[in-house]
Amino acid sequence: MADMAKFEEEISKLKTLEKDREKYFSSRQEMEMRLTESKNVKAELDLMDSDSKVYKLMGPVLVRQDLEEARSTVEKRLEFIESEIKRVEASITDVNKKSIEQRDKVMNMQKAFQMMATQAQQQAAQKK
């Protein structure tokens, strides 16, 4: 039955879309955590006096860093994370749209199969 193979293929596509959506949600959640962490770092840096000492962890070593350089780095990180969140959210929107379309397609195929089964039962009952 080619129709059944097509139906299974469409279900497989739907499952793939749902896995992709979960992956994007997970990615967005991770980005949100990084954003919160970076905002906290920025808030701490903003509280510091201009003569405060700032250290950056580079591998196993703490290296002194200029306060303005640290602020700039954190600001760039915030911008990057925010742009990544927007990109991931656009992907989520896209995959949600595709999932809805695919789900509708699968449901329509399922309805068609049910109608065919009902018709076959009615024809079998009429032959008796």
Curated annotation (Swiss-Prot):
Q: Does the keyword Cytoplasm apply?
A: yes
Gene3D superfamilies (UniProt xref): 1.10.287.370
SUPFAM superfamilies on file: Prefoldin
Show the Pfam families listed in the entry: Prefoldin_2 (PF01920)
Localization per record: Cytoplasm
Q: Name one GO molecular function term.
A: unfolded protein binding
Keyword terms = Chaperone, Cytoplasm
Where does it sit, as one GO cellular component term? prefoldin complex
Q: Which biological process, per GO, is one annotated for this protein?
A: chaperone-mediated protein complex assembly
Note whether Plastid occurs among the keywords.
no
Major localization listed first in the record, in broad terms:
cytoplasm
Q: Which family does it belong to?
A: Belongs to the prefoldin subunit beta family.
Quaternary context: Heterohexamer of two PFD-alpha type and four PFD-beta type subunits.
Give a short account of what the protein does.
Binds specifically to cytosolic chaperonin (c-CPN) and transfers target proteins to it. Binds to nascent polypeptide chain and promotes folding in an environment in which there are many competing pathways for nonnative proteins. Required for positioning of the mitotic spindle.
- Name-wise, this protein is Probable prefoldin subunit 6
- State the gene name recorded for this protein: pfd-6
